[in-house]
């Protein structure tokens, strides 16, 4: 039951995002809301004993429902870099059972993931002047390799992960004539949860803190 918890949460987020696509397309066809797009680049440093550094590029497409509120859906690519400890090798564990790792699969210190998320963004201040923004992304991220990802003293054993990423920063318009175009610079936190193997199966929580830079139009 515990092994299916993270997967169920990630799958629920995936289907929620898919169901929102039609709701976001309808305003575009009717012209009732303003379309907006974002491209963001992030680098985050892993925190804690079990950690991973993350480099991420994402794009978000959606609609501005008011000057202060945007909602959309997004996707991207992220590289996860780990610094594993080598005090444990689960491949040599004689106590393996049906919940443990698969010795036929390889291990890696770098993982490539695809995040899919719903994005909520709140702007504070006039869109024509420098102001603050608060961004919240909720979704799932998927490990695209069959290799186990070495983290800490064990291994990430599930490809579907829960994904949460809030950010706080400055929105800087590029021109008075077209305030829809702006640069965004902020501080980001990312939470990723999955399954983990270290002599037995357990939950894995990854925390990372870093910076995000982006462009909106």
Predicted regions mapped to residue ranges:
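Structural signature of outer-membrane beta-barrel channels/translocons
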Residues: 62-64, 68, 121-127, 169-175, ...
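Short loop/turn motifs that connect adjacent beta-strands in outer-membrane beta-barrel proteins
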Residues: 25-35, 51, 68, 125-132, ...
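Predominantly the C-terminal beta-signal and adjacent terminal strand-loop region
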Residues: 78, 84-85, 113, 131, ...
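Short glycine/proline- and aromatic-enriched beta-strand/turn motifs that initiate or cap beta-hairpins
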Residues: 9-64, 216
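Helix-adjacent hinge/juxtasegments
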Residues: 90-143
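Transmembrane beta-strands of outer-membrane beta-barrel pores
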Residues: 41-47, 77-81, 122-124, 138-146, ...
